[in-house]
Amino acid sequence: VLIACATLDVHRVLLIGGGATQVTGPYTKVMDLLKTGLLADYGITHIDIAGHPEGNPDDPDPEQSLIAKLNWADTHGMHSRILTQWSFDAPAVNSWIERLRALGFKQPVHVGIPGPATLKALLRYATVCGVKTSSQVLKRQGLSLGRLLLINKPDRLISDLRGYDQLHLFPFGGLARTTEWLKQR
């Protein structure tokens, strides 16, 4: 993959890890790859690192893991930004960003949010992705059959978010539906 990145003049990569029940390569964590120096050897100068405002079932301390990666990037002259797991819980995301900023981290934060989707689809993805708080928020909206089939749009969530640099959309309701919603904004 790194040879292809160098050949194609790719300088930015998104680094995510975990979730696999069986490791298939030499690296069990993103930090293992970072420590090799291979990214810089192949021309990678910018890294996007996953952030988990609601925690991560595969990491007992995801905030410390993120901080370690950000510090590593700074120490090694690598540009970094944070792309978060999707969330439906604006207060949790806002508090998480505030904690990072209070610790002195200034990297751009791209907050992951779901595009328009049914409550049923959002609950399914919340379970798969381990997004606990968002799952609880969605369940509080009511689980009647009619409610499960309504399309939920992220407009209110967006208006409640603070301190982020950009949004990163997860098109759980389909790419066409998300694209149409974006055109109407």
PLM regions: where:
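Conserved, mostly hydrophobic/aromatic
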Residues: 5, 69, 78, 111, ...
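Active-site pocket-lining/capping segments in soluble small-molecule metabolic enzymes
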Residues: 17-18, 26-58, 62-68, 102-157, ...
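Short, well-ordered coil/turn segments that N-cap beta-strands
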Residues: 9-11, 42-47, 79-80, 105-109, ...
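C-terminal helical cap(s) of enzyme catalytic domains, especially alpha/beta-barrels
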Residues: 93-94, 175-185
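Non-catalytic positions within long, well-ordered alpha-helices that form the structural scaffold/packing
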Residues: 6, 70, 74-75, 101, ...
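A generic, well-ordered mixed alpha/beta core segment in the N-terminal half of proteins
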Residues: 1-21
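Conserved beta-strand positions in the central sheet of alpha/beta enzyme cores
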Residues: 14-15, 83, 168
